[in-house]
């Protein structure tokens, strides 16, 4: 009886989530700041540099900046993987992202792309390392509603987001990434993952993530999950675990007011289903979805 109930509710949660985080097919973005011609030195440099990124990013802990060439043929590139990616996963995510990018932006001097579960690749004919770029950005939400008292939810959520943002911003020049979870009443938990490209300063990382959190709040407050993606930072929260936690990147929280809580229910939808939906870019546009333009 219990098992059956469990199975029913699990699959209904699951299908709900798959519909709900059905987001955005916006990536990749080709910038309209100039084109190169086929077989040009810039084009060859771009292809060489992009080809090196999957291996270099995965060998380097999930983040790499690199350049190739001289003068007007110089290409700058950045690649980053989600902080809990294995080197193998990082390689294949960056490889996929680059192939999509090259298919979509065959001759653009600058382009940017991300995949949902997630990796970021950006290249340009000028240096953008350490520069905070807030656009293009995408904000999407899980269509389920928060069912608990929103006032109490907000307090827990804000404190969790504050903790993960502080922890990630205070990371190193090779990793600015944090996850965290907080108890919401006796039976629910909130999970969050935030990450900046670690070429950003602490202050710029903090700013990128806080602007992403407020963007979520202004578009989608009351929804039970959301993602905000920008060229330099990634923000996501859900009411189920969707990352692999690691003590060294877990933000510590002040203990909740009522400490006598039983463990959270075990039934959580497998994050892969949602993540692969995000990754495949099968996102549906939603009322609150915000996509803003490119410079
Ligand atoms: C670059 O090429 C694209 C087509 O591939 C074209 O739409 C765009 O206008 C070009 N941009 C510039 C700045 O020439
Ligand atoms: C680019 O180079 C290839 C191989 O060298 C050649 O076959 C092709 O015609 C060239 N394309 C252009 C537009 O010059
Ligand atoms: C990246 O890869 C290239 C060639 O694959 C290699 O020569 C270079 O040293 C690598 N750079 C870094 C920073 O790992
Ligand atoms: C890289 O991605 C492309 C297209 O997604 C795929 O065809 C290719 O096999 C991948 N390469 C590796 C080494 O995984
Ligand atoms: C969430 O709440 C909104 C407005 O309160 C309602 O229109 C919507 O149907 C709810 N969504 C779900 C999945 O319950
Ligand atoms: C929600 O919680 C706040 C603070 O605990 C309380 O003041 C408020 O009455 C609650 N609202 C509802 C609708 O239960
Ligand atoms: C930032 O991290 C360092 C260790 O890397 C730690 O000593 C310091 O207390 C942290 N600062 C904040 C504000 O968390
Ligand atoms: C946790 O993070 C540390 C430091 O980044 C790393 O050395 C370790 O391999 C990670 N552990 C797991 C299980 O991923």
Residues covered by each model-derived region:
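Extracellular secretory-pathway ectodomains and N-terminal mature segments of eukaryotic proteins
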Residues: 2-295
